[in-house]
């Protein structure tokens, strides 16, 4: 007897992946696994798949529409996206998307750390020392008011979005949320600024390593830094090395979490870290059944072998479970569900 009602789970997954009940999308989903003879196999394989391209395109189009409205009126800003849509690990056909509106008037830096390194230049290569020197020589202190710049930018974004969208929520501290009623998508518009870390300078200032700080209007200043582009780059790169298997594992865990009867409080950030921590060599050639077993084994040994305190984010700048007992219990709950699915597959 199966541990779960997979037929019911398949209906929930189908509604999530194909919320508009598109006949074409449904036919594509069905055609890929019509030969599979059990519901558990169908559930696992569908849970690992990406959302249909048509749905994902509409999500991105909603973001581009917002960008165009802002671009018509704002100056001294650039635009970037962050989140699971950018790694194609989202599990909702009607996913929302985060649009970063980045103030170009100033950039936060770690200039003091750069100068400290130059005072004691040990352990760095000649190339790195050259980068540090050039960075210090080109550095100039911003004479404006960065907090006021971000506050003004947030107010401008609110004003533009209110004028363009009937459904617009400006109450959130870190973002403005609009609903594109034509495309049936939400877009979160995030006021932010650039952050240049010491590591960014040492590595030659690659774009993906550039950080951001997010403006909190309730506090009146920017929080962070975060490194969304590095996380996106690392997940995309590592998944390409295994023909997409990393992303399949991420989607699978997110779907199992979402379909669970338990309230599993793990975020995409947490699940990304769990899957990313697995060496590519361990799964580069595994099939879907073996991937399920690997995920169960990984989560089980994380807590059983007391390794949770060591697990860091994809970027490596934050501990995921350390000092967070509720998350540890959530991991155990997810691990238990995955183990039952593994048993049902075999």
Swiss-Prot record:
Species of provenance: Lachnospiraceae bacterium (strain RUG226)
Function description: Cyclic nucleotide synthase (second messenger synthase) of a CBASS antivirus system. CBASS (cyclic oligonucleotide-based antiphage signaling system) provides immunity against bacteriophage. The CD-NTase protein synthesizes cyclic nucleotides in response to infection; these serve as specific second messenger signals. The signals activate a diverse range of effectors, leading to bacterial cell death and thus abortive phage infection. A type I-D(GG) CBASS system. Cyclic dinucleotide synthase that catalyzes the synthesis of c-di-GMP, has no activity with other NTP substrates.
Superkingdom, taxonomy of origin: Bacteria
Family: Belongs to the CD-NTase family.
Taxonomic lineage from the root: Bacteria, Bacillati, Bacillota, Clostridia, Lachnospirales
Keywords annotated in UniProt: Antiviral defense, GTP-binding, Nucleotide-binding, Nucleotidyltransferase, Transferase
Listed InterPro entries: NT_sf (IPR043519)
GO BP term, pick one: defense response to virus
Gene that produces this protein: cdnE
E.C. no: 2.7.7.65
Name recorded for this polypeptide: c-di-GMP synthase
């Amino acid at each position: 007897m199966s541990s779960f009602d997979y037929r019911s789970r398949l209906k929930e997954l189908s509604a999530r992946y194909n919320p508009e009940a598109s006949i074409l999308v449904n036919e594509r989903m069905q055609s890929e696994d019509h030969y599979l003879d059990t519901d558990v196999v169908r559930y696992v394989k569908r849970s690992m798949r990406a959302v249909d391209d048509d749905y994902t395109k509409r999500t991105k189009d909603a973001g581009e529409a917002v960008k165009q409205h802002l671009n018509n009126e704002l100056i001294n800003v650039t635009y970037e996206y962050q989140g699971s849509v950018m790694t194609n690990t989202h599990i909702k056909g009607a996913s929302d998307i985060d649009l970063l509106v980045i103030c170009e008037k100033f950039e936060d830096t770690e200039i003091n750390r750069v100068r400290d390194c130059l005072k004691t230049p040990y352990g760095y290569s000649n190339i790195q020392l050259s980068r540090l020197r050039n960075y210090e020589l080109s550095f100039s202190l911003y004479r404006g008011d960065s907090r006021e710049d971000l506050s003004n930018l947030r107010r401008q974004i609110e004003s533009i979005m209110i004028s363009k969208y009937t459904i617009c929520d400006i109450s959130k501290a870190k973002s403005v949320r609009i609903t594109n009623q034509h495309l049936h998508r939400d877009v979160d518009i995030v006021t932010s600024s650039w952050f240049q870390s010491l590591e960014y300078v040492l590595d030659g200032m690659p774009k993906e390593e550039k950080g951001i700080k997010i403006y909190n209007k309730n506090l009146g200043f920017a929080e962070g830094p975060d490194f969304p582009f590095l996380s996106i780059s690392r997940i995309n790169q590592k998944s390409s090395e295994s023909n997409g298997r990393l992303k399949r594992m991420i989607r699978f865990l997110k779907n199992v979490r979402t379909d669970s009867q338990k309230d599993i409080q793990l975020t995409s950030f947490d699940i990304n870290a769990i899957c990313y921590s697995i060496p590519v060599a361990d799964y580069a050639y595994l099939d879907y059944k073996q991937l399920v077993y690997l995920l169960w084994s990984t989560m089980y040994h994380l807590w059983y072998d007391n390794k949770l305190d060591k697990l860091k984010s994809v970027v490596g700048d934050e501990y995921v479970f350390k000092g967070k007992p509720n998350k540890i219990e959530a991991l155990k709950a997810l691990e238990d569900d995955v183990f039952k699915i593994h048993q049902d597959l075999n």
